[in-house]
Amino acid sequence: MSLFPSLPLLLLCVVATSYSETVNCEDSQKICPAVIACNSPGINGFPGKDGRDGTKGEKGEPGQGLRGLQGPPGKLGPPGNPGPSGSPGPKGQKGDPGKSPDCDSSLAASERKALQTEMAHIKKWLTFSLGRQVGNKFFLTNGEMMTFDKVKALCAKFQASVATPSNAAENRAIQNLIKEEAFLGITDENTEGQFVDLIGNRLTYTNWNNGEPNNADSDEDCVLLLKNGKWNDVPCSSSHLALCEFPI
């Protein structure tokens, strides 16, 4: 005959014995008649399943981590603004006097005389080929035809002025020089009928043609030297021979 009547009856006895706090050995025999005697407690069972996560705890204090290595140097920044000018430096010492080359006064005088002689020859050549000299005036023409304003500009470029005869000799010299009618440095642009030179001085010598000046076209403010040596008033915008005078 088997010691345990049946397996289900045995399990029932084990459960009743595990969860009863006041059941003694005698009671257990009454409940489980198949159990002969009370034994010692059995071994612990396997751990149960993990429970649910608890509530979030408070934030902890920062940790004391290790300091990292120093990184490489950064790029150079843009240049700054220029600083203020410094104070002037101390004055330097006075230098030694310079040495002037020894000049031979006699040699300088001879060279100066030779230069003056050469300039006189050049002046004669110019007078013979291009111009006329009367007293301290030298008259020259480039043979070009242009307006009065352009003649003034041309003469001023060479530090000269438009030819203005102040006597019969100068008027005759200009007449012999020109082959075309030429402007003179005389005008009444400022005051009609009152002809003056380019400085503004009134004329002390005139040689008007018959019936001139007549201002025929109401704008004849400039003066022309005709081939016969007489003067005629003409518009300044007309083109005639350029003639300059150089002081000598």
Swiss-Prot record:
C-type lectin domain residues: 134-245
Composition bias type Pro residues, residue spans: 75-87
Pfam families in UniProt: Collagen, Lectin_C
SUPFAM superfamilies, per the entry: C-type lectin-like, Triple coiled coil domain of C-type lectins
Assigned GO CC terms: collagen trimer; extracellular space; multivesicular body
Comment, domains: The coiled-coil domain mediates trimerization.
Protein name: Mannose-binding protein C
Organism, as annotated: Trachypithecus cristatus
Species classification: Eukaryota, Metazoa, Chordata, Craniata, Vertebrata
